[in-house]
């Protein structure tokens, strides 16, 4: 009956280190139970890593809502309720808790190496943004520490692409890293890592522990805890900075966080922020107290330290930092550092397939990439696991029973190399799922999302209900595991690919006859429907102009008048037509628009007589037509004709007098006169 009242003390934990290796802690091997203090677990990890400067480091874990916590050395494992609710097995992440203000002053090489691994991980995950030139410099130092001096025989073109240094790494950055790496000849790994830390510590976001909060009007802010104080960010810009000596009180109540600062005029000002949950607010308060204690309090007496911490306490909550401060660590003479004959074991970083030249065909690129991925997966014995970022988004906690939460506990609860939720991500990116960024699946056979959303796959009906249930259970199991990089997921993915290939092969249909039938119907419809004809220029019927020309020529009389035998008075009495024109000249439009061209042609051809005269004059070399506004027939004397010629008026046109031509052979004078009636132009032929 003792089994009903006994408390299970078995404990199985995996610690993920900064070099991407695992340390397993169990009750059978290390004797760790749930009643064991957190300090014992820390000692096992520090002994495994061979660390002496241990106060900079800690163990972090996540609850089911992805809220991060630091393992409290003074509490037992059972008192960490959030950790116990996640297992077994339990997962802890080893990392830097307090970033040294100057990591180059760390005494031991192994400590600097752990800082190097942590900062390199921060740059890779986007928590430590840096410009391109700085990223190239950091990448070159990392390559020098990893591979040593540049060797043209060993390091062929594209060797830098096998490693990852920044998010969304580009080929231009890899070329810059390769150029700088060639100039770092002679640097040993410890020297290259020291130069890496010297460059990284000058970045603005180095050592900043970010916590997302809300300000007034629900505007998003980030509070960053640094070695020198608290910084406030809004829209990726620093809007406030408060040094630890100026901060007089840190307080929280429910989800409200208060930061009281002493101004230059000795007046205290309180700044209030809203956390996304009570647990997040309490975690922010604890981290603030510990940072202030570690970087600001050099006193060694416990009473003075407790008195200082009491000012930062909140109602019903007391938190005390039990470790040493940064000043105490620098003045500690009990251990001679660095230790003599210290040997640092460095692990190799994870490699990726080499970048393929862009000049190769796309098909060979995809085949080579798939082959390289398969070889890489077969050769590697471990899976890369990245420690969690302390900055989380404002997304609501997922349902514990949802498929996304039912993942392997040996992997970090976020996507590897996915978009990180933090300061340098837009709000839309922070609220978007890294694994499923789109809310609707796209139809492979359609060109856009607006097309048909009917599923392409055709499922055959099963005759047996047992087979249908078996298929359903297989699909359910394939959806349950969503962990990144797990073997079960890879096997499920291969199974889905194989199943899709089989289904696609069974469902192939020859659509050529159907497509030809559709084209034939469209062609017949276009031929039957005259409205579907399309032409660039509209063709106009010429029949009205031809009829008007024939009708007009009936009224044009061409009569020859023989002037011989006529007196001078009779010559003056030969009838003629006087036509006067008024109005503006015709404007010629130069437009390439078919519509304006049609309107211009329509206006030009609206007057039948005007269009007919244009064609007649073009054939008979007549004067170009002018708009006719008034016509009057007059018979005048020759003096009037001469007077009209002398005036040379542009607005009037008069028929010339009949001229006589002398025939040298016959000795006679003949004159030919063309007499026009109701015409817009006259011409005298001699």
From Swiss-Prot:
Its cellular-component GO annotations read: cytoplasm; cytoskeleton
* Coiled-coil region list: none
**Compositional bias annotation for Low complexity:** 479-489
Q: Where is the composition biased (Polar residues)?
A: 357-376, 418-428, 673-686
Indicate where this protein resides in the cell: Cytoplasm, Cytoskeleton
Q: What domain of life does the native source organism fall in? A: Eukaryota
Q: In which tissues is it expressed?
A: Expressed in many tissues. High levels of expression in brain, liver, thymus and peripheral blood leukocytes and low levels of expression in heart, kidney, testis and colon.
Task: Print the keywords alphabetically.
Answer: Cytoplasm, Cytoskeleton, Phosphoprotein
Q: Which GO terms describe its biological process?
A: actomyosin structure organization
Tell me if Phosphoprotein is a UniProt keyword of this record: yes
Q: Does the keyword Phosphoprotein belong to this entry? A: yes
| Molecular function as annotated in GO | cytoskeletal protein binding
Cite the InterPro entries for this sequence.
Band4.1-like4A_FERM_F1, Band_41_domain, Ez/rad/moesin-like, FA, FERM/acyl-CoA-bd_prot_sf, FERM_2, FERM_central, FERM_CS
Composition skew (Basic residues), residue ranges: 588-601
What main location does UniProt list? cytoplasm
Q: What is this protein called?
A: Band 4.1-like protein 4A
Task: Identify the taxonomic lineage of the organism of origin.
Answer: Eukaryota, Metazoa, Chordata, Craniata, Vertebrata
